[in-house]
């Protein structure tokens, strides 16, 4: 039924069939009082055109924002689609809110269908359309976003205060909408996902508000509108059913708590898992060799804490903007389940570093001085292009105890499955932990999620000439970005960008 409303919207709000009139008089406010100040508006291409089927003269009563003073009245002339005059008024209200910040309370419009026929005067009548009410009760805040895909919209949604936000299109409801638009200049058809404050007494009017707003902001004519509305603060949370954790990285727990933000585990490119929220404390070494404390909160896969700590260590190692800036030495981790009732944001604990904390990278442990290093799609190209990595000093080295060769299967951020092959220095006493470290490493650099891998390790210089093989597991060709799985079966990964850095080094 929502889509049916959208199809009506195509015909009634933003009619796109070119017909008479091709242009109308356009003016706003005082300019409408003097005909010599009226300008010609081309209905098919003007940024402020609200249709192609009619010319119209609208009388509006408005406030300059929801917190403005006395109401003002003015006239607006231009191109409209007046098949449904109420929808035309809502479209005008959406355009004026986005362009001038006006909150249109009432609107009356008279229309005609000849070129520049809108020379008439319109006054507000008792039957004027009520549009955006300032005294309405409803929502105080909603989530706000506008992106080309739903996952990114959810990930980037921010708080919007309905009465003060310039982008808000009402104060009674929160909305989530998928709209299809056509750019009036290029003809490009785009799909957008939108959340925000809106007036949604009926969905057709709400879609008309969006149509007017889009016409000004995007120079685009709305073709379809599929909208859902609710009337509780933040009720349009796209992540309501998704696991969420607090996320921060600081020197101590107090600073982390003061600066922490929301992390959506299945969508955030920095998420280190989907099954748990965690708080970690420990020691790290910076690029100058200084030992420092750290405190971290975020999403984890914490069924095995050692692997979770190695994932964090590998993630920090993969910082290509600050190579070698963070080498994780010790890790004390506490985890909780965000999937239980009221479990989201459960990682509020402050663990204390204990003598038996998990050791991650051990730079002083002796092992091979150097290993073969490469990052390619398969073993053949890896062997052809491999270089030498000095384990103790290379900023991207993942250990000093072993040389390793790994093959893996990964999910890219767009959901596609890919394979990769890596050789390099690594701590490989525990293969599962080694896999976790490199999984975190690749997550930082390429935002890839590790699914499966096989790794073989050795302890002599440049001994990593192995060719491990994956045990095939049936996988879909692609998967939604909202689904992130970890099949830690000796998983190990690395990064193309890093390989370039190795060559430079």
UniProtKB/Swiss-Prot annotation:
Q: Which residues lie on this side of the membrane: Cytoplasmic?
A: 505
| All ranges on the Extracellular side of the membrane | 20-483
Signal peptide stretch: 1-19
Localisation: Membrane
Supply the alphabetized keyword list.
Answer: Membrane, Signal, Transmembrane, Transmembrane helix
**Where are its TM segments located?**
484-504
Entry annotated with the keyword Secreted: no
User: Could you say which tissues express the protein in this record?
Assistant: Component of the acid-insoluble and acid-soluble organic matrix of the aragonitic skeleton (at protein level).
| Disulfides per UniProt | none
Chain segments annotated as coiled-coil in the UniProt record: none
Bilayer disposition of the protein: Single-pass membrane protein
Keyword Ion transport recorded: no
Q: Mainly localized where?
A: membrane
Q: Which GO terms describe its cellular component?
A: membrane
Name of the protein: Uncharacterized skeletal organic matrix protein 2
């Amino acid at each position: 039924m929502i889509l049916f409303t959208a199809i009506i919207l195509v015909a009634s709000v933003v009619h796109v069939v070119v017909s008479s009139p091709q242009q109308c008089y356009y003016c706003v406010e005082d300019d409408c009082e003097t005909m010599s100040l009226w300008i010609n508006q081309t209905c098919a291409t003007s940024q402020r055109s609200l249709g192609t089927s009619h010319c119209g003269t609208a009388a509006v009563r408005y406030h300059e924002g929801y917190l403005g003073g006395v109401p003002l009245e003015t006239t607006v002339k231009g191109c409209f689609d007046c098949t449904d005059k109420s929808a035309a008024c809502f479209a005008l209200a959406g355009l004026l809110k986005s362009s001038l910040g006006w909150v249109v309370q009432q609107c009356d419009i008279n229309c005609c269908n000849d070129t520049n026929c809108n020379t008439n005067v319109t006054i507000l009548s008792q039957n004027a359309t009520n549009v955006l009410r300032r005294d309405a009760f409803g929502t105080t805040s909603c989530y706000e976003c506008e992106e080309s895909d739903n996952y990114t919209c959810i990930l980037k949604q921010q708080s919007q205060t309905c009465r003060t936000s310039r982008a808000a299109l009402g104060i009674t409801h929160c909305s989530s909408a998928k709209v299809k638009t056509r750019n009036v200049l290029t003809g490009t058809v785009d799909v957008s996902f939108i959340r925000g404050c809106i007036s949604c007494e009926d969905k057709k009017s709400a879609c008309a508000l969006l149509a007017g707003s889009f016409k000004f902001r995007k120079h685009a004519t709305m073709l379809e509108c599929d909208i859902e509305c609710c009337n509780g603060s933040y009720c349009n949370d796209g992540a309501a059913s998704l696991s969420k954790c607090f996320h921060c990285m600081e020197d101590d727990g107090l600073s982390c708590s003061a600066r922490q933000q929301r992390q959506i585990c299945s969508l955030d490119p920095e998420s280190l898992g989907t099954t748990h929220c965690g708080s970690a404390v420990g020691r790290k070494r910076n690029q100058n060799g200084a030992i420092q404390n750290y405190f971290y909160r975020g999403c984890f896969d914490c069924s095995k804490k050692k692997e979770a700590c190695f994932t964090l260590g590998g993630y920090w190692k993969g910082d290509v903007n600050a190579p070698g800036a963070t080498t994780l030495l010790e890790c004390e981790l506490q985890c909780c389940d965000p999937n239980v009732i009221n479990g989201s944001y459960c990682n509020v604990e402050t663990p204390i570093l204990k003598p038996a904390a998990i050791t991650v990278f051990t730079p002083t442990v002796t092992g091979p001085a150097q290993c073969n290093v490469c990052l390619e799609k398969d073993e053949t190209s890896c062997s052809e292009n491999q270089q030498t990595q000095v384990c103790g000093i290379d900023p991207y080295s993942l250990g000093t105890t072993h040389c390793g060769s790994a093959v893996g299967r990964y999910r890219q951020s767009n959901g596609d499955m890919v394979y990769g092959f890596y050789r390099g220095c690594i701590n490989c006493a525990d293969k599962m932990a080694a896999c976790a470290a490199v999984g975190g490493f690749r997550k930082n650099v390429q935002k890839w999620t590790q699914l499966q891998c096989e790794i073989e390790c050795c302890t002599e210089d440049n001994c990593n000439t192995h060719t491990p093989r994956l045990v095939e597991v049936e996988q879909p060709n692609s998967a939604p970005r909202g689904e992130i799985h970890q099949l830690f079966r000796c998983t190990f990964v690395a990064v193309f960008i890093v390989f370039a850095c190795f060559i430079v080094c």
